[in-house]
Design a protein with these regions (language model features):
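Active-site catalytic microenvironments in core metabolic enzymes, especially phosphate/sugar-handling
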Residues: 220-223, 350
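Charged catalytic cores and adjacent phosphate/nucleic-acid-binding surfaces used
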Residues: 3-154, 160-174, 185-215, 227-380
Length: 380
């Protein structure tokens, strides 16, 4: 699952491609038919998206599926490796001694080359083929392994949901815990809370907790990292909280050294557990900050501070390639939704996708921990 896409490619296996093509071009929302062949068709959907449909016999479906789910770079490297084994590989299958061997199961594409099956998220030519040949691919994190959301905004700040509603929804998701993480006072535009308001919020959390004993409600803030690297709430208040996330919300365009030092100062704060949406990018709107990432990763590893993977679709931050790099330093991660509305809690799957593309497993993600392990980690 990539952050953004261009055209949409759909593949299918059928013994009657003509019937499928007819149904495809008549699908509700198709505003223009670009091409319509016997086994291929291209349409414009809803006057915006181009959708291509290609239909092959069932015995070629596996190789075609691999072709469309691998990036171009991955496929080039895979085909180059096949050539070293005197094989020619295409979306139709393998040519062996001039004869075509068709593949109807995608996993058999990799098995035929005597390598482990490579999950689609890893097919970016970042060393996955070498790892598959050595049987050293990581076991990737699954959505079902998430025990709770560590970054949810309530209507105490700029969220549009009550703490009770957050807790009920989290119970339905099967979570063991949920973290109420409102903005702090320095972010006035988001109705950030001061110390007095945070103590009032805690009373509501305690009341809701009594009504929901099966899930643990943890108290948190998303504290603002000021331009100086200082935090905008008193240390004594931070020490009362279960988890603290620190994020940059202002002064986005500092130079690389200044921004790096600013973030590292927050990482080193003894009460900060997580750095929220670390790069600051908003897809299609704002580029990432200028940051020396190796320095940030080293600081996180030294201070045992986690980096957030924001599952919010316009953020998806930290980006997958940086997750992969950070993992090599021993950095831990928290996959969070940054939910402000109830349906945002369902966005977790997008953060999981980023983590998987970043080669992350369950052991790399702190909100796969049990409640007791998470609390122990936060006390590190």
């Amino acid at each position: 699952m990539k952050e953004t896409i261009g055209d949409i490619d759909i593949i299918a296996a059928s013994s009657d491609p003509k019937e499928l093509i007819e149904a495809f071009v008549k699908f509700p929302g198709v505003s223009q038919i670009i091409t319509q062949g016997e086994a291929k068709s291209t349409v414009i959907y809803n006057q915006k998206a181009q959708i291509d449909l290609e239909i092959l016999p069932e015995n070629e479906y596996g190789s075609l599926l691999q072709h469309f789910t691998g990036s171009k770079e991955h496929n080039v490297t895979l085909r180059t490796y096949a050539q070293t084994k005197n094989l020619s590989f295409s979306e139709h299958g393998f040519k062996v001694g001039g004869k075509l061997k068709r593949i109807n199961n995608e996993k058999d594409v990799y098995g035929f080359l005597k390598m482990d099956w490579i999950p689609p998220e890893l097919r970016e030519d970042r060393g996955e083929i070498e790892a598959a040949l050595k049987h050293k691919l990581p076991k990737l994190v699954e959505l079902s392994e998430i025990k709770g959301d560590l970054h949810v905004h309530s209507n105490w700040s700029d969220g549009q949901i009550s703490i009770s509603d957050i807790v009920r929804a989290s119970e339905k998701l099967g979570y063991e815990y949920v973290v109420i993480s409102d903005h702090t006072v320095g972010l006035g535009i988001a109705h950030g809370l001061n110390e007095v308001e945070l103590e009032k919020r805690q009373k509501e959390i305690d009341t809701v907790q009594k009504a929901h004993p099966k899930i643990k409600i943890l108290s948190s803030v998303e504290v603002n990292i000021k331009a100086s690297g200082d935090l905008d709430i008193a240390d004594w208040m931070l020490k009362k909280l279960n988890i603290v996330t620190a994020s940059v919300h202002t002064s986005f365009f500092q130079d690389r050294e200044t921004m790096t030092n600013r973030i590292i100062k927050a990482i080193a704060h003894p009460d900060v557990d997580i750095i929220g949406h670390p790069s600051g990018r908003i897809i299609g709107q704002r580029e990432p900050y200028q940051v020396d990432w190796p320095k940030v990763f080293r600081a996180c590893a030294e201070n045992k501070t986690a980096l957030e993977i924001s599952a919010f679709p316009d953020r998806l931050d930290l980006m997958d390639f940086l997750c992969k790099d950070a993992k090599t330093y021993g950095v831990k991660f928290a996959i969070n939704t940054d939910a402000h509305q109830l349906h945002h809690l369902d966005l977790m799957r997008f953060g999981i996708s980023v983590a998987r593309r970043g080669w992350l497993g369950k052991e790399d993600i702190i909100n796969t921990y049990s409640l007791s392990d998470l609390i122990d980690w936060a006390k590190r």
